[in-house]
A protein has these predicted regions:
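Short glycine-rich substrate-engagement loop in P-loop NTPases that contacts/grips substrate
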Residues: 90-121
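Catalytic cores of nucleic-acid endonucleases
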Residues: 430-459
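A short, basic N-terminal segment
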Residues: 1-58
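Conserved lysine of the Walker
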Residues: 71-72
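Accessory nucleic acid-recognition modules appended to NTPase machines
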Residues: 2, 9, 251-415, 419-421
Length: 459
């Protein structure tokens, strides 16, 4: 009696994965049964970020952002749109590269069996979570763009959730990314305007696009005046936004009138503890205490020596874990502005902000005994994030340099956000309408800029 063993080569298995992962090759109705697109539809929020709109043929795009923000859904929405626009189905290839090696990436392009495409056509390659590939994957991409004429002419989109890996890849791939000018894209949790469009009970008037440099313009004032009749609803939605944030799964819970689901809280915990902190040697309790202490101090310049002392770790360990969060796109730095120019002051401590309320609130969401974040701090954080989100959208290269700062006056009073992109304006947050606000106004008045007081209500 003979036993027949199933044998499969690595490339053969890769071919199988390609056919199962690219169902549009054989089924034009693929999107009706796609689990990611169906989950997005069933969530009830119908959110399309548009982050991959207007892909130009022949470019190599890098889409960066935190895990669970919706990059995979954005890719599949883009694939559906390309097919509807008439791109032949065999010209589109998507792979999930999480757990791959650099050799797997090379084999994908050179050695797998792909369906033939029409003459003079090029392909679209969507390589999801490329930054999780082990080895010199960026060097393999460079070699493929240099030595394979077909791949060099193709449109490539790589996504990733590791800032350090993607920054290094940008350097390695310089000169091999095509002629496009908008080839670096960033996907962040949705902003307040998108949140309002999903949750508002009554339709709001059309919103003009106000650039950061126009915040004190007549157009901005008119937009403000036009929204006054909806003030009560906008205040409630801002409060909700500060609690739920902009990750699509969390927004879906807000839309349904439910607390943030325990499953999504666990997912975000895993994003931090098992992915961002995968090289950490801290136990869960200590790393959670570090996060709690870090986020509680968001409104003030960060002192890592003090934070480390408070949670029982040395400063070097605190620095390392801060970098883990930075590399995972889970926080951003707001440095102090140098006197006389738009550069960070290297001798001053930065302020650190989480990218979303669920990141900052996670220690409390997992354990109610840990402190929640004060709404005034969450509001300041989200105002800064709104400014950052818009500037990254308008100026794609800006996310790789410092362009938003805090400012300290000669009387040691702080202004929350200043930037040369604000066209002479300075932003100071004020969460509630009661109490004194003239002190904040006086701080801005004493600065070189015109003030803009940002509140949840009307003073």
């Amino acid at each position: 009696m003979y036993t027949i063993k199933s044998m499969a080569t690595k490339i053969g298995l890769q071919n199988q994965e390609l056919t199962s992962g690219n169902p549009w090759w054989r089924n034009p109705e693929w999107h009706k049964t796609d689990k990611d697109l169906n989950a997005a539809t069933e969530s009830g929020i119908d959110y399309k970020s548009g982050v991959l709109n207007d892909l130009a043929t022949g470019n190599l795009y890098i889409l960066r952002g935190p895990r669970r923000v919706g990059k995979t859904v954005a890719i599949k929405q883009t694939i559906k749109a390309l097919l509807e626009a008439g791109v032949p189905q065999h010209c589109i290839i998507r792979v999930s590269a999480d757990g791959w090696t650099a050799k797997d990436l090379k084999n994908l392009v050179l050695h797998t069996t792909l369906p033939p495409i029409p003459k003079d056509s090029t392909r679209y390659w969507f390589i999801d979570e490329a930054s999780a590939i082990s080895g010199q994957w960026d060097s393999e991409l460079k070699a493929l763009r240099d030595n394979d004429p077909q791949f060099a002419a193709d449109t490539v989109v790589i996504t990733g959730s590791n800032s350090a890996a993607l920054t290094e890849a940008m350097g390695v791939l310089a000169g091999r990314r095509g002629p496009g000018v908008d080839i670096d894209r960033t996907m962040l949790p949705m902003g307040f305007a998108s949140f309002v469009s999903i949750l508002a009970q009554t339709p709001l008037p059309p919103r003009p696009s106000i650039a950061p440099g126009e915040l004190r313009s007549p157009r901005a004032l008119q937009a403000f005046v036009d929204l006054i009749p909806w003030l009560d609803e906008l205040v409630k939605l801002w409060e909700t936004y500060l609690q739920y944030g902009g990750f699509p799964s969390s927004v879906a819970c807000a839309k349904a009138g439910q607390p943030i689901s325990s499953s999504f809280i666990k997912t975000i915990f895993d994003v931090i503890q098992k992915d961002a902190f995968k090289n950490s040697r801290l136990d869960v309790a200590t790393s959670t205490a570090f996060q709690e202490r870090l986020w509680q101090g968001m409104a003030s310049p960060v002192n890592l020596t003090s934070i480390g002392s408070d949670v029982g770790i040395v400063k070097e360990t605190a620095v390392r874990h801060l970098q883990y969060l930075r590399d995972a796109f889970l926080l951003w730095d707001c440095p102090k502005r140098q006197s006389g120019n738009w550069l960070p002051n290297p001798l001053a401590q930065d302020k650190i902000y989480a990218i979303d309320p669920i990141i900052a609130r996670l220690p409390n969401l997992r354990n109610a005994q840990r402190k929640d974040i004060d709404p005034t701090v969450l509001s300041e954080m989200q105002v800064g994030m709104a400014l950052r989100r818009r500037l990254i959208s308008d100026l794609p290269d800006a996310s790789w340099d410092d362009f938003i700062f805090y400012f300290t006056s000669t009387t040691r009073k702080e202004i929350d956000f200043v930037s040369h992109h604000l066209n002479g304006a300075a932003i100071e947050g004020k969460y509630i309408q009661d109490g004194g606000w003239k002190g904040e106004a006086a701080t801005v008045d004493a600065s070189p800029w015109d003030g803009l007081m940002v509140t949840r209500n009307i003073l």
